[in-house]
């Protein structure tokens, strides 16, 4: 199992990963991941977050290294654009608008919707369309296409079930999680203090509402996927320096450039060697100046 570079607890603190929800909203199943509370807000134990993040990143790395497909899922407003951005950067797939029931368990229906989307695009791009259809009909087709794109843009090239699901906000994405469980698809998920960690193969205790936190998670996820992809390409004899595209992964030139910039994984210890005293002091200082996005 490959090991990644140590997770920087200070970086997690700066991103507000330690801020949970109000104590009145907690899920008792998260008790073991909670460090304490400040002003009626639960504080997440970042030592556990760092260690479990390392495990989750290794799962992402190994999945992509073996040519597996990853589906990133988060339809909440503050995560939507970030999820799409980083999924595209690492050549993977995403759902960021609305989870359509059966996206995993009833793939045939979803495939039909994707086919419908492609037909609409082809029709609208045709020069004959302006002659054969009225302006109203063209407008109706354009609206249908846009609606389908909102839900399907990130999975239109996904021809089979994903090998790993990566979720931010398990409460909001419970339907996606239930479908993945039915199909035995392993799940990486950020679990906040109001979350249920059951059925999550790789839980990462952390704030799932803060934009800064979400961006940090997605950046780490994408880097792990890119490193796995690079390793897979090396095994296949692909020269990343001269490669212009990799159709199986739907890579863009931006993705290839990102591959070259991604820091390498190392076989070092998974977590920063901070003492409990240092961690306690850093956490205390952070809580004194807290700026939580959770409620």
From Swiss-Prot:
Lineage top rank: taxon: Bacteria
A Gene Ontology BP annotation from the UniProt entry: translation
InterPro entries: Ribosomal_uS2, Ribosomal_uS2_bac/mit/plastid, Ribosomal_uS2_CS, Ribosomal_uS2_flav_dom_sf
GO terms under cellular component: cytosolic small ribosomal subunit
One MF annotation (Gene Ontology) recorded for this entry: structural constituent of ribosome
Keyword Ribosomal protein: yes
Range of residues in the leader sequence: none
Family annotation (Gene3D superfamilies): Glucose-6-phosphate isomerase like protein, domain 1, Helix hairpin bin
Keywords recorded for this protein, A-Z: Ribonucleoprotein, Ribosomal protein
Family of the protein in this entry: Belongs to the universal ribosomal protein uS2 family.
Record-given protein name: Small ribosomal subunit protein uS2
């Amino acid at each position: 199992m490959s090991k990644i570079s140590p997770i920087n607890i200070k970086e997690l603190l700066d991103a507000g990963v330690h801020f949970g929800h109000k104590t009145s909203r907690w899920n008792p199943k998260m008790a073991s991941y909670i460090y304490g509370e400040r002003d009626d807000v639960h504080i997440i134990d970042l030592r556990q977050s760092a260690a479990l993040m390392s495990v989750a990143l290794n799962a992402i790395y190994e999945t992509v290294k073996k040519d597996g497909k990853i589906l990133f899922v988060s339809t909440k407003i503050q995560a939507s654009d970030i999820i799409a951005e980083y999924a595209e950067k690492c050549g993977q797939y995403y759902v960021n608008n609305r989870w359509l029931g059966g996206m995993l368990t009833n793939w045939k229906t979803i495939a039909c919707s994707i086919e419908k989307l492609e037909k609409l695009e082809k029709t609208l791009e045709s020069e004959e369309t302006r002659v054969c259809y009225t302006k109203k009909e063209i407008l109706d087709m354009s609206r249908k296409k846009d609606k389908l794109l909102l839900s399907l843009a990130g999975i239109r090239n996904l021809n089979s079930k994903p090998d790993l699901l990566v979720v931010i906000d398990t409460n909001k994405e419970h339907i996606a999680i239930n479908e993945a469980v039915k199909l035995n698809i392993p799940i990486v998920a950020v679990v906040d203090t109001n979350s249920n960690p059951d059925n999550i193969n790789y839980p990462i205790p952390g704030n799932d509402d803060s934009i800064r936190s979400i961006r940090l998670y997605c950046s780490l996820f994408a880097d792990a996927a890119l490193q796995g992809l690079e390793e897979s390409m090396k095994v296949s004899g692909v020269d990343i320096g001269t490669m212009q595209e990799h159709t199986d992964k739907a890579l863009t030139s931006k993705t290839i450039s990102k591959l070259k910039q991604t820091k390498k994984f190392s076989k070092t210890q998974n977590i920063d060697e901070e003492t409990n005293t240092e961690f306690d002091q850093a956490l205390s200082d952070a809580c004194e100046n807290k700026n939580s996005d959770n409620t």
